[in-house]
Amino acid sequence: RSLSLNSKNINLFILKESQKIKNVDLLIGFDSIFKKENKLKKIIINSQENEIKNLLKFIRTYKINIPALYLENSIKKGKIIYDLLIYINEDQSKRIEITGKIKNTELNILKKKIFKDINFDFNYRAKNLQITDLRLKYRNIDFTSKDIQANIKKNLITIKADIENKINLDLLSEIFPHNLKEYFNEKIVFSSSSNFEITFNDKFKIRDYDLKSEIIFNDTNLNLKEINLKKYIKNFDKKIFLDEGKMNLIINKKNKTQLKFKSTYMLDKKDNPKILEIDYAKENDLEKFEIKTDLNSSKIELEQLNFYKNKNKDLFLDLIITKNKNIYEINSLKLFNDNDLFKLKNIKFDKNFKIQDFSLFEAKYYNKENFFNSILISKNKNTIDLIAKNFDLGLNIEKNLKSTNKESFLKLFENLNAIINFDIKLAKIDEEHDLKNLVGRSKIQNNKVIKANLSAKFDEINTFTYNRDQIDGKIVTVIYSDIAKPFVKKFNFIKGFEGGKLDFTSTEINQNISKSELRIYNFKLHDMPALTKLLSLASLQGIADLATGEGIRFNEFDMFFENSKNLIKINEIYALGPAISILMEGYVEKKKLVSLRGSLVPATTINKTIAKIPLLGSILVGDKAGEGVFGVSFKIKGPPKNLDTTVNPIKTLTPRFITRTLEKIKKSK
């Protein structure tokens, strides 16, 4: 039994601080009145709406309270209505229960994070706080939660919550360790569902936290302006389109972050959607990326390997990358379909993305010419072994002959120093020629091939050698081949070539220019449109017929030229044969323009007896004395596939032509 004392609409003061109270009930034990003890059994206080800051000041006036002081300084505004129940036991111990509402509150934590429009109901009992129907705004994003539980033990406060909200890039960038604004439109808003647990001390300093969040997005553009993929993905346009996407994010105080990303993507909205999966994990400074995707809609080109995949052909990517501070490593890369396979392992990069080291590269694939390559390159310390069953070297040879940029792949390395051992069972040179058992080794020092010795056979008789060494401080490359045709074909302006042996020497003058000499012996030219047209325009139809028939034979061909990145400057080409001799010069711009000029003389002897040469006399001079063509000057110019030829008759030969011819005649004797 108890006695109730009630008072309504009062102001409760402690010193100068007050609270507006709607109702106060004091329950006194009935028996205690007669015993003159007047023991309180329960106190019920129902407040009116008060300012939260005033309540905190009121509490601090009653008792020094550090959390209350911190909250007082953090709360900018807000209202509270509360019902306070205090149960007093026989031993005078107390049990407190508080229920109430927080309205339109603004909270500034550490003067950095501002939470606005905070509204919720709360219930506190036995050091457990339950918050329901929470609504608030942070960075103009609405957050809601049906239930939040807080447990207060000693000097620690642990909060568990489920939150539904929209999330923008500002907020996502705070919890994710990369600036996502570089990749997404700033106006984009994601849907998020999160569970979190966070522990504070009595000064509201975070002691521990664990966040699990699921983020949903649809119809989103991923901007990749800073990532240069165009070189490898030909239909890449600096962005991809994402749809039906989901991210699962886990973050905790132990410096661990996990993100699982799964979405469909398109390079073009007309494409069929393909799957993209990314697993990201971060612990302290170590980050790990696992990427899986379907590249069916991508046009893929790997120029160094002469590989191309068109759209709507399967190709899948599995990639694992780790990052430690600013240092990246490709732990494994697998690019594959039913017919093609590319594998890389343990590629370590420096901060400038230059390769420091690698352990393995394997490729089994069909190239653009539908030739199947099977290559294995492994590295152990400073030794690299290149072993291949089949390897198409045609493109590599062409670059070696025609450009100074011969070691461009070495620019991928930070500073490679290694010995490379070669063992290639079959090396394709062109559609007609293969090298068997290409073996040897090369030495790379400071990213430069300073020495190489390679040898192979076309067949039991014809051989090939490649040598590279330093002579007088300059790198000199020498190629000899008993069969010249596959190498001569690499020069687009030389067509219709048959027979001959080749001797090629190139000296690197500096990083941008090399000087080369190409000599070919005992060969024929036939079905060569430019030469046939030249002979026809020069009224040398008889020799022109040879050019389209059995061919025009030459005893020797000399070419002296200089290579730069996209230009071959021809200082001199001299070809000597029993029917005609040619002297010319000019230049060839890579894939753009051929420009040649020179002289053609229809005989091997330069004297006044041209008319007496059997068979050719009537062709060259005609039936009447003084008729016929002594020689012509010519110009050949235009794109490689559309050359224009002009000729003019000459009556005398230049001293240079005569000198070069006499040199050859003397050597032949």
Residue ranges of each PLM-predicted region?
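Membrane-proximal interfacial segments on either side of biological membranes
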Residues: R1-I10, K22-I568, I573, G577-K669
